[in-house]
Amino acid sequence: MNPRRKKRLLITSLLAVALSLAVGLVLFALQQNIDLFYTPTEIIEGKKETGIKPEVGQRLRIGGMVVQGSVKRNPESLKVSFDLVDNGGGIVTVFFDGILPDLFREGQGIVAQGNLLNATEINASEVLAKHDEEYMPPEVSEALVGMDNFKANNK
């Protein structure tokens, strides 16, 4: 192999390694921003298709209906905890330190974003409630079909 071809091969190899490294770093950085959606039953039992459960400490979004009588507020601070349930019967406790949305109520569908503390507890950094009487995110709507106080025609 002549020196000119060796130089081209070396430069091409270095560019391929640099590109691979750059792609790897970008994917690693984006991994921090991925929030997978789960229902309470999926957190406890795993996803239906794969059986994969979220890991402790993983960032995620959870959607479900707030259980009647489960909201507990700390009178000294903004801390609140409540239970979420879906049609699969799984119940997950959500802890939140902040101001809840005005539309947050017991018996209402919500989505909470946060970190998984253990198999049945979430530390939420954000709680989202329906913005009007008709709208519900499709994932939450599917998870709540069949519940007593949920209308399947919510869209």
Swiss-Prot record:
GO terms for biological process: cytochrome complex assembly. Gene3D superfamilies: Nucleic acid-binding proteins. It is a single-pass type II membrane protein. Residues 1-8 are cytoplasmic. Residues 30-155 are periplasmic. Keywords: Cell inner membrane, Cell membrane, Cytochrome c-type biogenesis, Heme, Iron, Membrane, Metal-binding, Signal-anchor, Transmembrane, Transmembrane helix. The keyword Glycosyltransferase does not apply. PANTHER family: CYTOCHROME C-TYPE BIOGENESIS PROTEIN CCME HOMOLOG, MITOCHONDRIAL. This is Cytochrome c-type biogenesis protein CcmE. It comes from Psychromonas ingrahamii (strain DSM 17664 / CCUG 51855 / 37). The lineage of its organism: Bacteria, Pseudomonadati, Pseudomonadota, Gammaproteobacteria, Alteromonadales. The gene is ccmE.
